[in-house]
Amino acid sequence: MMGTMTESMSDLKNALENLSPAQHGFSYLDLERAPVAEGDLSGWIIPAKDLYDVAGMPTTFGSKARTRMATETDPFIAAYEARGALIPGKSVSSELGLTVDAEPRDLPAVHNPIWPGRTPGGSSGGAAAMVARGLVRAAHGSDGGGSIRIPAAACGIVGFKPSATTLAVHGYLTTSVEDQAFLHQLEPVLDRPLRIGVLTTPIIADTEVQSEYLTAVAEAAEKLAAAGHEVIEVGGWPEAETTFDHFTNLFSYRLAELEHYDYIAEWLREKGLHVTAEQVRESETYARTLQARLAEHWGVDVILNPTIASDPPATGAFTSLPPAENFAAQARWVPWTSLFNIAGSCAISLPWPVPGRPQPAAVHLGSLTLDDAELLALARQLHV
């Protein structure tokens, strides 16, 4: 289970002494690095996801063959570094963030600290593992289809995807909602009761939902109802297949000119080569109106659903499959999260205790009408 939070680089060094890369989740370490500024994040140690550049550190993009030395720092990472945070290294990601595991190409895979032998989820799996293990208080991640929320769910921590006009958005993995609000510089305030829709029907894949996750959602719904919200059951999304087609268009089109491709990157690149610029424009137009149409269809402010359909699968469960089967298996495990990426909505995964075992399940709140601060305020009613 989660360890005690480290509070200094000295603590981090000591904590790492007996851990392998597969356990600690770092793809690169610079334990002599010093803060570049002082600010409200002074004292925070926040590793950067290894899909993004930090000057003076290698960026692997989740693949040994893609590794390069960075000369500049990604703007999002530079912004939290300018607030005083220290970046001790990079966290493991799947290749290009394309899959919901933490198994980079020709580099060590990361193990789930609370589920030995199983995936920590992904693509921000290294970040989730180090937060869940208590090595750091927070870690940087990014979410283009669930890549913050899925590993947070798999590792029993909190993952928040801010609202955005693009599929992918930067964010953090933490152990608390309070830390999410502080990191994003938001004041969580909710001044009205909400209408909340409980959705347990998988959206993008036909799959069975494990009972522990259904129970978690039911218990969360009861707690929200007790807090004064109107909670109703909602059915599936009739446009699910069309929505996922648009998501796949936008997700794969950016890979059409990819170099150094094989396995699932090659498979997605091939799909992207068949997506036209006109189809991309159609998908972007569809995405811009999706959140409002979801709100109208369901008639709710927020959707409450399981984050993942079951406990994490074994390490290698996805990568052992041919690419098309891998992609389909991922969709069966995470049949909800990408809906909120294409809609541009903010969304959050929260751990939920399961009696009789140490590992929690996970519930997910996806906004249809709330802004980021309001969703965090609602999440705080379920998990501090």
Regions found by a protein language model. Give the residues of each.
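Short, hinge-like loop/turn segments at secondary-structure boundaries
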Residues: 105-108, 155-159, 249-252, 321-323, ...
